[in-house]
Amino acid sequence: MNYQKNKIYIVFYKDNFKWWSRLIKWWTNSNYSHCEFYDGEYLIGISNEQRVRMKKQPLNEKKWDIFELNVDIKTPIHNFYKETQGAKYDWLGILLSNIFNFHRHSKDKYTCSEWVSTIIDRELNIIVPKNYYQITPQDIYEILKFHKII
C-alpha cells in the first residue's frame, strides 16, 4: 500500500502472533486486539512499549487492517501526542474497568483504544457514552464505519 504523507490512517492489529492478542480478541469478542494511528511512516499511540510514543515502523498488511481516515485530524493527533507523550499503559484500569467492571481507571494512563477514542471524540464528538476507558479496538472500528469516517 502506498501511504500519502499528508494523510492519517487508523490501523487495527488482527494477527494472533502473541498470546495476549488472542486473549484480548477472545475477551472482547473482537477481530482486533490493538489500534493506533499511522502516518505512513510512524505508529502513533500506546503499545508494546507500555507508553504513549511514536515509532517508525512499516506495517505488514497480513497483520494489520489499515484504513485511511476521511477527516483531517493530523494536528489534533500530534497535539494530543505532545500532551500525553510518555504516559503509561493503564493496566489497573483494564482490571478494574474491563475485568471486574468497577468503572475505575487512571486519568493520566491509557489503553490503546482509550487514547485513540479520546482524540477521535474530541474532534468529531461521535462517541456516546464518553467512557473511553471501556472502548475496544473493535468498538472504534464500528463507530468509524457507522459514521463513514473509514
Which residues make up each language-model segment?
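Protein maturation boundaries and topogenic segments
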Residues: 1-8, 141
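Glycine-rich catalytic cores of cysteine/serine-nucleophile enzymes that process amide/ester linkages
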Residues: 9-69, 96-107
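Generic secondary-structure boundary/loop-capping signal
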Residues: 20-21, 86-89, 132, 137
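Generic recognition of short, well-ordered alpha-helical interface segments
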Residues: 72-76, 111-114
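A structural motif
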Residues: 73-95
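Activation targets extended, charge/polar-rich intrinsically disordered C-terminal tails
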Residues: 97-150
